[in-house]
């Protein structure tokens, strides 16, 4: 559960590693009190150590569990008079095709990557609405537009997040709640490093594999979590007040480059 909070600007971020942790750090530096939610005890502990407890809290939460999210939102409602930002970032990326993705795999990736965004947005909406000028940022992906092989479940959820964001934005604008999505390309995260390790030949160099990933991008490198966090900072801030229902690519020109 969340402990007592005394802050004028509050944000909830789902996920406790990689991009989510960088977003939390950036929002803390912007003056937010950040509640970071994750279901991996090791990642939660590392995030707690990284952020400290003065301007952030890390809460154990499975965003795909409707009852747990409802309890979390109710508890938060007793401690806050409003929520300024919700950043839905938690995600998993299992590998599989239509043949190899099992029903259990499908339910898990949809539960975390899509249903989790709905549950957090649904149960926290009263707190967002009460602010009158809150912002929601949903993490999609370039793979919501164009796809690699063998990522059926992940790509499906990321494409759905684009439609989810547009629909939510249209409905919520009347309440002063702005909703946008972010679509990163290859970003240096634990998830990307895991993928790179699986593709690095025995005796090969992980960094060389990551450099190869970068060559697909017009800029010639992978992105950093801090670069993504800077975009989120803009989208939850007052300067982006006319941004509603958009998808903001941060992909180093990946989709602009024709790799032939």
Task: Label every PLM stretch briefly.
Residues 87, 173, 178, 243-245:
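Short, small/polar-rich loop/turn modules that mediate ligand/substrate recognition or access, typified
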Residues 3-35:
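Canonical Rossmann dinucleotide-binding motif of NAD(H)/NADP(H)-dependent dehydrogenases/reductases
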Residues 141:
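Residue(s) in the substrate-gating loop at a strand-loop-helix junction
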Residues 97-98, 105-110, 213:
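Substrate-binding pocket helix/loop in short-chain dehydrogenase/reductase
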Residues 146, 233, 244-260:
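Short C-terminal tail/terminal secondary-structure segment
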